[in-house]
Amino acid sequence: IYDDVWMMQHFGVRYKRSKIFDDIEALAAYFQNEMGLRKGDVFTIFMPTTVQSIITFYALNKIGVITSFVHPLMGPDYLKEQLEVLHSKGVMVLDLLVKDHIGVINDSGLPCIVCNSSDYSEGFKKYGCKVGEGLIKGIFPKYNKAVYYKDVVKTTARVVGEINNADDIAAYLNGGGTTGKSKTIKLTSRSINELTCRVSDIDEIHDPGEEAEVIVLPLFHCFGLIIAVHMAMCNSARI
């Protein structure tokens, strides 16, 4: 219902809805056609809150794949446990996390999508990110089954996606729990959208794409995923 307004902003660079939707489509097609992901499979996002992690969640949801959000500051043993327990079919990781986690990811044998800070940067900030990325590549080992995010979203491939999947699980979140080990929270597409509808009035976005909301909460947190990100985007705020 909205025009091609500004949808996201990263390092001062704005991106319109058309660009974000194109990247969602390209990723969804890659997951289905190249990685062979199917409805009910699990894919792990081991990332902070970034443009890439938000786009990837929607791409996975389009084809009925469950997103497992894992806190990027958790250690390699925890990541290994989550990959195994949830039977993840792949993982997305930020290049800055390579030092402590490349061993676990390579040992898992899972395909990996590597994200760079420069993916959605421009100008001097992009150049600065590129310098750091070059140093990382020169110092640390490489992922065995890796493709770079920036290469995936270059394509124009499209897929139909799953229809009427409201009651399917959309995401796994890891709660702290009151006792014992971390608990896995299951969120359906319906629960995400119903909560968004019930509280969407608190946003009151009057100028789509121009009024912005700063996202400081993580996606592995229910409030961060649903209220801070999904609700804001549904109300046409620029995030």
Residue ranges and their predicted role:
Residues 16-18, 161-163, 170-197:
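Conserved AMP-binding A3 loop
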Residues 125, 137-174, 181, 205-212:
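Conserved pre-ATP/AMP-binding loop-to-beta segment of ANL
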Residues 1-34, 39, 119-143, 160-163:
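N-lobe entry segment of adenylate-forming
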Residues 21-27, 152-156, 166, 185-206:
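Conserved structural elements of the adenylate-forming
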Residues 6-38, 44-50, 54-58, 75-80, ...:
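Conserved AMP-binding/adenylate-forming core of the ANL superfamily
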Residues 74-106, 195-214:
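Conserved ATP-dependent adenylate/AMP-binding module captured primarily in the ANL superfamily
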Residues 64, 193-212, 220-239:
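Conserved AMP-binding/adenylation subdomain of ANL enzymes
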Residues 44-46, 53, 57, 61-94, ...:
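Short beta-strand->loop structural element characteristic of the AMP-binding/adenylate-forming
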